[in-house]
């Protein structure tokens, strides 16, 4: 009780002191004079926090008048009338300056360019070495191997090369694989890659995110290491081992500052490289003449060319774009005027994009396409040329029309090196033809995946199709010798339910996300062994898989720290494969010590 009495006396004393303080300040203890109205009585004896002292006012610095020069003012608001000629000249001059900046920033390529002029920030002696090396490659004939033309289609489609003994033979070829090279070939993320077929060399050609072509002579003499430059090989070298043991690298700005979407070595003799990019062009780089030539291009920069493939003659190419178009380029003399055409086969929208196209090496009139609408389709291109089309105004015709001079009606003006399509068939025209009796054989087969289909490729024999899909599966479609693809009398059989479906399904994580290049399983072009393909694995391995769906080998070491999303194989050396990653680094794998 004594403690409670003492506490109560102390509390009353505190209340009295607080009331006296409020009275001295002229404040009502009940809060009636507060502008915020009454507030509930305090429930505790917490002391009121002390008010913070007001910050000291800083003296404003003296304003110093600075002559900022003339300011831009609106002539329209000021009511001034611009001099017509002077104003027009000024606008044209500003437009020219913007165009120059655009060309410089995009690194736009001319129609025909010398390779030496496409190399940037490289010493002259290294450019000469590159030119000499490419010309030495051109002197070596390396035609691509195709199925024998004497074999009938029905015999060729017999599935007799996937017996267990062939699978074991392939596994034996990939024994004792090891990492032979790990070199930064391009400055940016790898988008596409291929290996030249020359057996005595390992020439890897790499396309990156910004139109740069990396040329890697993996077995060539090492380049001298520049002074004060850190090692970027990425391999753990043994003590005393010389640096730069991984060949020579040259970098060429092959396209404008856009991703190189696809590359193919000239199938006739290996003396050049065909490539497409998001700058909407198809180009050919000749190793013998050392010139890069534009073969095909779109005026509309929104029509990104996603993929292409060549016919065995290398005189024709099929391309697919973002807006659902299939385009054809033909350089033969008889097709000079009509050799550039486009057909829109996908309806406009998110599913319009065609991400892949492949030409059947046994029957080149058949192509397969991979679409964002989840479908893989097989087309008979012989029917496409029967579809009605409209003339596409060329750049020259548009300029003439703007200047008041027009070409004759019904004719399409062309420049000496005009590469734009001359005719186009829109989606409604294509679908109308497809629904007509004449268009019965245009689409030979189709199959729908669970999600978008990223790629579709015919194997080197023309007997199977390999697809990659975002539904996390790789699929192999075997062609029946009695199907409509082989026998024209059975047209339409593969369009029936269950008429065309995968024979092998391999589960594979294809969720690359935003920052990795899309996975595309790629057939090996080597025809000395059973059909097999390579594909990057999200667990950072490079997988080799047979056409039967059996995993042959998964390649990985501690030195590989990124996913090899882009893969390729040496066409004539079965156990030599490469993988490329986001940093522009390429890993070369091979077995034994012969490399």
UniProtKB/Swiss-Prot annotation:
Q: Which GO terms describe its cellular component?
A: nucleus
Q: Which Cys pairs are S-S linked? A: none
Keyword DNA-binding set for record: yes
Q: Where are the WD repeats?
A: 185-226, 255-297, 300-339, 349-389, 448-487, 519-556, 558-595
Q: Which InterPro entries does its entry note?
A: WD40/YVTN_repeat-like_dom_sf, WD40_repeat_CS, WD40_repeat_dom_sf, WD40_rpt, WD_repeat_DNA-damage-binding
Q: Which GO terms describe its biological process?
A: DNA damage response; regulation of DNA damage checkpoint
Checking PROSITE patterns in the record gives: WD_REPEATS_1
UniProt keyword list: DNA damage, DNA-binding, Repeat, WD repeat
**Source taxon at top rank:** Eukaryota
Q: Where is the composition biased (Basic and acidic residues)?
A: 417-426
Q: Where is the composition biased (Low complexity)?
A: 29-46, 405-415
Concerning Gene3D superfamilies, the annotation shows: YVTN repeat-like/Quinoprotein amine dehydrogenase
Q: Name one GO molecular function term.
A: DNA binding
Asked if the record carries the keyword Lyase, the reply is no
Q: What does the similarity note say? A: Belongs to the WD repeat DDB2/WDR76 family.
Q: What does this protein do?
A: DNA-binding protein that binds to both single- and double-stranded DNA. Binds preferentially to UV-damaged DNA. May be involved in DNA-metabolic processes.
Put simply, this protein is called: DNA damage-binding protein CMR1
């Amino acid at each position: 009780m004594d403690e409670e009495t003492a506490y109560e006396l102390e509390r009353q004393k505190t209340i009295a002191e607080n009331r006296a303080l409020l009275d001295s300040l002229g404040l009502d203890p009940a809060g009636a004079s507060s502008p915020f109205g009454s507030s509930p009585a305090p429930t505790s004896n917490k002391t009121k926090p002390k008010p913070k002292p007001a910050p000291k006012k800083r003296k404003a610095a003296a304003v110093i008048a600075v002559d900022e020069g003339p300011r831009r003012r609106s002539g329209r608001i000021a009511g001034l009338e611009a001099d017509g000629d002077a104003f027009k000249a000024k606008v044209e001059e500003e437009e020219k300056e913007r165009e120059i900046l655009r060309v410089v920033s995009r690194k736009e390529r001319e129609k025909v360019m010398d390779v030496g002029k496409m190399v940037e920030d490289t010493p002259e002696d290294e450019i000469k070495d590159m030119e000499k090396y490419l010309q030495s490659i051109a002197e070596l004939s390396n035609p691509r191997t195709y199925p024998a033309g004497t074999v009938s289609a029905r015999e060729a489609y017999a599935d007799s090369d996937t017996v267990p003994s062939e699978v074991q033979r392939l596994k034996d070829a990939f024994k004792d694989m090891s990492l032979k090279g790990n070199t930064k070939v391009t400055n940016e993320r790898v988008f596409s890659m291929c290996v030249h077929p020359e057996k005595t060399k390992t020439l890897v050609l790499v396309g990156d995110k910004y139109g740069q072509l990396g040329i890697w002579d993996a077995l060539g003499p090492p380049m001298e290491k520049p002074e004060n430059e850190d090692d970027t090989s990425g391999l753990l070298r043994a003590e005393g081992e010389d640096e730069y043991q991984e060949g020579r690298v040259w970098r060429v700005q092959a396209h404008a500052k856009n991703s190189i979407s696809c590359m193919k070595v000239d199938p006739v003799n290996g003396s050049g490289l065909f490539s497409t990019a998001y700058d909407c062009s198809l180009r050919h780089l000749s190793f013998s003449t050392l010139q890069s030539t534009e073969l095909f291009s779109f005026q509309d920069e929104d029509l990104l060319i996603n993929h292409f493939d060549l016919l065995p003659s290398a005189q024709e190419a099929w391309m697919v774009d973002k807006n659902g178009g299939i385009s054809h380029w033909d350089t033969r003399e008889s097709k000079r005027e009509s050799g550039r055409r486009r057909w829109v086969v996908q309806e406009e929208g998110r599913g319009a994009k065609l991400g892949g196209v492949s030409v059947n090496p046994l029957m080149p009139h058949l192509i397969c396409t991979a679409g964002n609408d989840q479908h893989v389709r097989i087309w008979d291109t012989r029917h496409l040329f029967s579809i009605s089309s409209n003339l596409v105004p060329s750049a020259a015709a548009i300029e003439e029309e703007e200047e008041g001079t027009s070409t004759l009606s019904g004719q399409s003006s062309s420049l000496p090196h005009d590469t734009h399509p001359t005719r186009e068939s829109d989606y409604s025209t294509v679908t109308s033809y497809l629904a007509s009796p004449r268009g019965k054989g245009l689409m030979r087969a189709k199959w729908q995946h669970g999600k978008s289909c990223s790629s579709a490729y015919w194997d080197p024999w023309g007997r199977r199709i390999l697809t990659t899909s975002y539904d996390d599966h790789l699929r192999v479609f075997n062609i029946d010798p009695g199907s409509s693809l082989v026998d024209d009398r059975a047209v339409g059989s593969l369009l029936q339910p269950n008429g065309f479906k995968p024979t092998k399904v391999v589960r594979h994580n294809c969720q690359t996300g935003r920052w990795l290049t899309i996975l595309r399983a790629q057939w090996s072009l080597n025809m000395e062994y059973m059909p097999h393909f390579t594909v990057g694995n999200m667990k950072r391995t490079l997988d080799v898989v047979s056409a039967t769906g059996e995993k042959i080998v998964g390649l990985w070491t501690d030195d590989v720290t990124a996913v090899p999303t882009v893969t390729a194989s040496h066409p004539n050396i079965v156990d030599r494969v490469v993988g490329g990653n986001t940093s522009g680094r390429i890993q070369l794998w091979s077995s034994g010590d012969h490399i």
